[in-house]
Amino acid sequence: MEWFQAVMKRRKALKIGGISAMTAIGSIGVMRSVLAELDFDLVKETRTKMGTLVTISVVHRDVSIARTIIDEAFVEIDRLEALFSRYREGTPLWVLNREGILENPPSEMLEVLTHALEIDTLTDGAFDVTVAPLVDLYSNSFEEVGELPSEVQIENALSLVGSQGINFDRDKIVFERDGMSLSFDGIAKGYIVDQAVKIIKKEGVRGGLIDAGGDMRATGEDLLGESWRLAIQHPRNPGSYLCLIDLSDGAVATSGDYMQYLTEDLIVHHIVDPRLGTSPDHTSSVSVIASTAAEADALSTATLVLGPEKGIRLLNELPGVEGILVTKDQEVIKTEGFSRYEVTI
């Protein structure tokens, strides 16, 4: 990743039918008569994938071709989801977590693992795919006894966390400690969206958008030949948005305490600091704009863990990356260049 290398050198839709973390918004107030004169059609379809609703939109002159492209993109999503699911028996990740070794790992898994370890280094461990034992500990504790795990349990789980415990090459992935496991939840969805967008980028396609429950990747133009307008959800006001942004070719992803939580006060949620073993208590949500959904996905999680000061400072250091953060006190903090994408209506 060019931005990773650069930083390390230096450091040595209108259709709001319910706003998710991000929602595509079409141009507002356009007359039907104007739309009727357009040479292109907007075709969109929503299916349940990767544990969320995934909507794929394609702008094309031929509706049937657009539908075929959308079908092909969903096929690619299915193929990759089968590689990265840690709950589906027999998947490569399931085998690795169960056996502690995976022979002949898929090239896609090696690519994502390499990317994840780069971000681990960049964030000083705030993003760590070996966090799975901690995430599972919290989930199982609340499911089985309805309360937080004990300090001893957390310490035991923490002993299994740390990317230095992963050894891999093109032939195998091996854990150095028994009980380790990986979760690509903070990066795989973005990666899968990126690969599906490659399917959309075909001759004759004016533009496309994939919305995967908080991870969005835009390419080209919308139906009116403009940038895709997206709404970022407010973390404490369901159904309303924090801000609007315009994207032509790029991605935006949101991580938030409200997305999956274990306590009603949102203090304990699905994101766990892999260094401390607890959910971050300073940030409600982070949305990151980057060139790819994988980068935006991982960096939004890492920034939420790092918190306002360190997180925003990190994003400001990264070329081509911008972000917006909402603290637990509902203070809104933006990176220096975020306004380039923000839209005022």
Predicted ranges, named:
Residues 1-345:
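Mature catalytic core of soluble alpha/beta enzymes
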